Design a protein with these regions (language model features):
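Aromatic-lined carbohydrate-binding surfaces of glycoside hydrolases
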Residues: 40, 63-68, 81, 92-93, ...
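Structural detector of well-ordered beta-strand residues that form the stable sheet scaffold
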Residues: 223, 306-308, 352
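Ligand-binding face of N-terminal immunoglobulin V-set domains in extracellular IgSF glycoproteins
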Residues: 20-104
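Aromatic- and acid-rich polysaccharide-binding/catalytic face
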Residues: 308-334
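Catalytic-core region of carbohydrate-active enzymes that cleave or remodel glycosidic bonds
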Residues: 325-409
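Hydrophobic h-region of N-terminal signal peptides that target proteins for export
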Residues: 5-18
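Catalytic domains of carbohydrate-active enzymes that cleave complex glycans
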Residues: 1, 233-236, 247-279, 283-313, ...
Length: 484
């Protein structure tokens, strides 16, 4: 079948342009997104085991800096099948049983190498992009957690699963991040307190959503936010049926009252569902004192639950706390931190890094340059970390389709997909980097390339990456190595 698309003003990703022919290399089982040149490209033909889909990366508006009234356009919304003016792109997919060799699709030449990439659910890479279901409901104009809402979320969540996502973001309280999101997060658990002071809990929505997320392929881990919300405020329904909102700060008597009975009951409920071993009480950039109190409280009251934390300190600074999943801010990664990772991995603990409103680069902002998102995805493989954490996958602003502006942070910080379910090019490049990371893991485990892997990994020092700007060259070095 013949497909013709138009592309404008772009750079080539994950391929080499030879004259008017684009050459790309893939492993069997791989899916790769590539940008096309700034000319008309004829992509034609079909082959058993290899498919090529094409589309356009459409322009999206964004402000150049937070609170700025200066706007720009950037091609970012990747729509398969689109023939609208925009950058052309193709998604190349090689089946696990594809025959190695050269495949010509007009001006696109695909070389399938004799190596096999496992399916995303089998990747060891730990991807943790936080989801926001309420944002989907608002954008689609449907009732939260209605049949229509789940139908709208499903393709978005399955696309995230296809990138190797290992966690499902759930909420234990209203507004776990206070009011920083455009759409409010609600609680998936209802807390009730009777006149005699007894507590009861309704897990109906929690169960429904976790089951849905798992059907979409998200998990197995369940990240529960949080016992330490920003502002410390929690809600419950009082004896008169009215919602009570009050502070529950770690160390105060009401904290123990509010969370004590809940943790015991929650653990029993999770055990009955078979989810206890996969569930984390998750916290975001909380103080050492808060984390210490909460972790000890959880270990005492509900020892089957795990603790997850995103912070900017080495795990050893919480030496009296067992943190099962720790994510370090990229700006604070140094060799002493990395030296602790192997011991944590031997204990079955997860250690990742995260980017958010910082660093300025490399990142996945609208303003980020070519290669940055790829580098962010690949970086953990080079330094021995398990993966990447990022807020957020889909916490959109007012216009989820045409404008990535968000008043508080750099444009693109809050979302990697669009309200119609289209991925951003940033997300596709992040996924390309994750795929390359998984390839490097496979090559490392196979042995025989230690010197080359060491040389490549040396290029990925976090502090040098933050100060650097040659991300396209790094991407090329990675792709050349894992595809040779």
């Amino acid at each position: 079948m013949k497909k013709i698309i138009t592309a404008v003003a772009l750079c080539i990703a994950a391929g080499a342009l030879m004259g008017d022919v684009l050459n790309v290399k893939v492993w069997r089982g791989e899916k790769l997104a590539v940008l096309l040149s700034d000319e008309y490209h004829e992509i034609e033909g079909a082959a058993p085991g290899v498919s090529v889909e094409t589309g356009a990366v459409l322009p999206v508006r964004y402000n150049k800096s937070p609170h700025s009234l200066e706007y720009a356009l950037k091609a970012d919304r990747a729509v398969l099948g689109s023939r609208e003016p925009g950058r052309g792109f193709a998604v190349v997919t090689a089946a696990p049983d594809a025959k190695p060799g050269r495949y010509e699709f007009g001006q696109l030449v695909v070389t399938v190498l004799d190596r096999v990439l496992p399916q995303p659910r089998e990747w060891k890479y730990y991807l943790d992009l936080w989801q926001h279901p309420w944002a989907v409901a608002r954008v689609k104009g449907v009732k939260p957690f209605s049949k229509e809402h789940y139908a709208a979320m499903e393709p978005m969540w399955r696309m995230l699963s296809d990138a190797g996502q290992k966690t499902l973001t759930v909420t234990l309280v209203d507004q776990p991040w206070n009011h920083q999101c455009y759409d409010a997060y609600g609680s998936m658990v209802v807390h009730r307190k009777s006149a005699d002071g007894k507590w009861s809990f309704d897990y109906s929505l929690f169960d429904e959503y976790v089951e849905f997320g798992r059907r979409c392929g998200l998990g197995p881990h369940i990240s529960c936010y949080t016992m330490c919300p920003w502002g410390y405020m929690v809600d419950y329904i009082g004896p008169d049926g009215k919602v009570v909102r009050r502070s529950a700060k770690p160390g105060e008597p009401f904290f123990d009252e509010y969370w004590g009975d809940f943790l015991v009951d929650f653990s029993k409920h999770l055990e009955s569902k078979g989810w206890l071993k996969d569930t984390y009480i998750a916290m975001d950039e909380r103080s050492p004192d808060d984390l210490r109190y909460i972790a000890k409280f959880v270990r005492r009251v509900a020892p089957g639950l795990k603790i997850a934390m995103a912070g900017n300190r080495r795990p050893s600074e919480f030496s009296d706390i067992e943190i099962d999943s720790y994510s370090q801010a990229m700006a604070h990664i140094n060799q002493p931190f990395l030296d602790e990772v192997p011991a944590r991995q031997k204990e079955g603990k997860v250690t990742t890094y995260y980017i958010c409103c910082g660093p300025d680069k490399p990142n996945t902002f609208m303003k980020s340059g070519p290669g940055e998102a790829f580098v962010c995805g690949f970086y953990p493989a080079a330094c021995g970390l398990d993966g990447i954490l990022r807020w957020a996958y889909n916490s959109w602003g007012s216009d989820a389709l045409n404008d990535m502006t968000y008043s508080r942070w750099t444009a693109g910080d809050v979302a990697l997909i669009y309200g119609d379910g289209s991925p951003s090019w940033r997300f596709l490049e992040l996924r390309n980097g994750i795929v390359a990371a998984e390839k490097l893991r496979i090559l490392r485990e196979a042995g025989g390339q230690d010197a080359g892997i060491k040389e490549l990994s040396a290029k990925f020092d976090a502090q040098k990456l933050i100060r650097g700007d040659n991300y396209e060259a790094l991407r090329k070095a990675v792709m050349d190595f894992v595809n040779r």
